[in-house]
């Protein structure tokens, strides 16, 4: 019973505090930035030895450093939010074939999505010197920045699964309590 109650408490807390869970899945605001990463890599025709292309490593470094505990926690603090709830809103990925670093933010309002995106980009700019000195020389150019509103059936399904999970846990708790009560009655009858 204690484990089930613990799970119920966690599910209720998540439903209450999660920003992603409170977003209307039919009105998801998204802010996105696509950034182009260039390095000094050049193909040397006719040469057996080619200089290494660090683009993939640079993209991986940004992706890792923008989504690690320290980064997400610092951004979450700016918005008075717990790290685990901010982490649900922020997506960062790199594609070495296109040399793009993409940052995507989902939020309940356009203002929130844009503000969180600004914070992630500021964090990215603060990482430049570290990545430059440890991975390699590069430059970053903002190719596009967009804000949109969309429907997310995945989010709708996730929210429904969360509610269904809570209902299932509550039903399980009711069943356990009924079994406990029946056992108590049987013990009392046996004692008489």
PLM features: residue spans?
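Soluble oligomerization/assembly scaffold segments of membrane-associated complexes
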Residues: 1-20, 26-191
